[in-house]
Amino acid sequence: MISDSKLLASAAWDAQSLNELKAKASEDPAANIRPVARQVEGMFVQMMLKSMRDALPKDGLFSSEHTRLYTSMYDQQIAQQMTTGKGLGLAEMMVKQMTPEQPLPEESTPAAPMKFPLETVVRYQNQALSQLVQKAVPRNYDDSLPGDSKAFLAQLSLPAQLASQQSGVPHHLILAQAALESGWGQRQIRRENGEPSYNLFGVKASGNWKGPVTEITTTEYENGEAKKVKAKFRVYSSYLEALSDYVGLLTRNPRYAAVTTAASAEQGAQALQDAGYATDPHYARKLTNMIQQMKSISDKVSKTYSMNIDNLF
């Protein structure tokens, strides 16, 4: 069996590594399920990073063939680090689905093989990851989220995963709070000139904030009663800056310690309300409803397909 450390120490996406893994998997498929799953998870992460890079302008002042080469190598290193240890959870999910001793629950949807061979990944490596997934995943699950919501989750899902790994805040809680505070990105706080503030989490501009601010009318609760008040909120240059500031706010402030150590997203939601993040007395319940909705959709997607090691090679 090939160890994870050996795979990660090598050039994990070169042909030699894949051929070696293919040979080992053919000899003993059951013993090599985990390294195969790790390899596939790594390729998915690298493809996501590449899709993000492709969306950026390529004619900047510091853009050249050399910088693009170094960026590609850097992305490979990031992908390797992200899939080390627990990774993003994709590999573990595949291991559970491909291990006979751990069958899916009886009430799950009948499994349909996911037609996603390795040749497809290699042949269409320049194709957007979302297009590949759309072709591979069956369409017979009940998706109750509207289109704008799905686009919002797709944009923030990977950054939320990274922020969760760095801070300890459950990633479903990060997504749910961003969705609740911004109305799935459709009702986010605006600047005076109408431009977006990128303030996804409704963070107010307290006395120690030195950046730009915007003042809006918002709803606050006093003794359980809703009131309209004027309040100043922080303004960011991007969603990533907003996410970084949000994580820093929770990790640096001792009163949010229960949020960063919460065992589940639902417990984290209650910890946020207990710490006084929002004045809404129903804040935790609203977050929990969104968290459960997101988890339900994820479960329905995962139960509609299964992966077989023979179909990967």
Curated annotation (Swiss-Prot):
> Where are the stretches annotated Catalytic?
148-313
Name the PANTHER family for this protein: PEPTIDOGLYCAN HYDROLASE FLGJ
Name of the molecule in the record: Peptidoglycan hydrolase FlgJ
- Presence of the UniProt keyword NAD in the record: no
User: What UniProt keywords are attached to this protein's entry?
Assistant: Bacterial flagellum biogenesis, Cell wall biogenesis/degradation, Glycosidase, Hydrolase, Periplasm
- What is the enzyme's class at the highest EC level? hydrolase
Chief subcellular site?
periplasm
Q: Which family does it belong to?
A: In the N-terminal section; belongs to the FlgJ family. In the C-terminal section; belongs to the glycosyl hydrolase 73 family.
Name the job this protein performs. Flagellum-specific muramidase which hydrolyzes the peptidoglycan layer to assemble the rod structure in the periplasmic space.
A Gene Ontology annotation in the biological process aspect, one of them, is: cell wall organization
Question: Where is it found, in Gene Ontology cellular component terms?
Answer: periplasmic space
Q: Does the keyword DNA-binding apply?
A: no
Which domain of life does the protein's organism represent? Bacteria
Which compartments does it reside in? Answer: Periplasm
Q: What else is known?
A: Probably exported via the flagellum-specific export pathway.
Annotated catalytic residues: 220, 245
Enzyme Commission identifier(s): 3.2.1.-
Instruction: Return one GO MF term.
Output: amidase activity
